[in-house]
Structures are given as C-alpha cells and as structure tokens.
C-alpha cells in the first residue's frame, strides 16, 4: 500500500509541474488519504508494541 502512496505522490508532483489541475488535485487527494491511513496504522502499531513490552 505504501507503494501506491508513493506512486500517487509522484503522479501528483508531475501533474503539478505540468499544470494539469484536475489530475493533480485528484492524485494529491488520494495520496493524502493514503498518508493519513498509514499514519493511523503506524500509531496503532506503535501503541500495540509499547503495550506488549510491559
């Protein structure tokens, strides 16, 4: 899933440089959603790891 987040990020950057507003906003939106999903998964796994150590 991280692979797809990076792909959409690169597509958003390229579209932003070329000035394609519709493509850029859609790709950036998907990349932003994936970023927050990974952030939540990271925090949950971090908390689970800390709880298991105790």
Swiss-Prot record:
Keywords: Cell membrane, Membrane, Transmembrane, Transmembrane helix. InterPro entries: DUF1328 (IPR009760). It is found in: Cell membrane. It comes from the Bacteria. Pfam families: DUF1328. The chain crosses the membrane at residues 3-23, 30-50. One of its GO terms (cellular component) is plasma membrane. The keyword Transmembrane applies. The keyword Cell membrane applies. It is a multi-pass membrane protein. Belongs to the UPF0391 family. This is UPF0391 membrane protein RC1_1636.
């Amino acid at each position: 899933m991280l692979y797809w987040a990076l792909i959409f990020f690169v597509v958003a950057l390229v579209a932003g440089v070329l000035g394609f507003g519709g493509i850029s906003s859609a790709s950036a939106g998907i990349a932003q959603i994936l970023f927050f999903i990974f952030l939540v998964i990271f925090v949950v796994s971090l908390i689970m790891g800390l709880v298991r150590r105790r």
